[in-house]
Amino acid sequence: MWVGIISLFPEMFRSVTDFGVTGQAVKKGLLSIETWNPRDFTHDKHRTVDDRPYGGGPGMLMMVQPLRDAIQTAKQAAPGKTKVIYLSPQGRKLDQQGVEELATNENLLLICGRYEGVDERIIQSEVDEEWSIGDFVMTGGELPAMTLIDSVSRFVPGVLGDFASAEEDSFANGLLDCPHYTRPEVLDDKDVPSVLKSGNHKDIRRWRLKQSLGRTWLRRPELLENLALTDEQEQLLAEFIKEQRS
């Protein structure tokens, strides 16, 4: 996967390219990340990248010319057809379904806004989709872009050692993840659930599904409203609720 980034602070993306799972993916050639700084496309000695908004009001907008030139240069450098995304509070909220949709693209170009945002005409002419990571305001689009890269890259073949990890994590099936345990067997007088030590894979699968359903019911009940539960899932959830209330 190729990811291009338009940002006034490209150095921030070293945390993606140099560390963790994404850093390893870059080293292996599974993920390619390139950055373009609009400051490099300015024509004045101050390298100005902001401008006043029409109509007045607080704050500034990103200057059109350097931003557009950076976007068009990045598009030309992309290895193929590229989806252009603007990280924006007005965009579609990123969720697991959205992550999986974005992961089907071989090339993504992410535009990170700053100040009060960008000229609406740039969005209309250069952007394919707007995406948000939540209903809150941040100082720029860099951290949302990193979030998107991290979540989407998990679905690039070879990035995770076990691809099933991406399919079984929280939200992959619309549910929160079940609890997990490792050694020691007893920690602060709390034992690992006996079913996980039983070796019975059928019982372990049912326990994990039950806990996943129950945790979703307890913490994010609104997620269940959008799911069509199977008969088995309905039964396991009913058992969990009964146990909680007994």
Swiss-Prot record:
GO cellular component: cytosol
Compartment(s) where it occurs, according to its Swiss-Prot or TrEMBL record: Cytoplasm
Keywords for this protein: Cytoplasm, Methyltransferase, S-adenosyl-L-methionine, Transferase, tRNA processing
GO molecular function: tRNA (guanine(37)-N1)-methyltransferase activity
Domain of life: Bacteria
Chain positions recorded as S-adenosyl-L-methionine binding sites: G113, I133, G134, D135, F136, V137, M138
EC number, as in UniProt: 2.1.1.228
GO biological process terms on file: tRNA N1-guanine methylation
Matches recorded under HAMAP family: TrmD
Protein's job: Specifically methylates guanosine-37 in various tRNAs.
Family: Belongs to the RNA methyltransferase TrmD family.
Quaternary state and interactors: Homodimer.
Protein name: tRNA (guanine-N(1)-)-methyltransferase
Species annotation: Vibrio atlanticus (strain LGP32)
Protein's gene: trmD
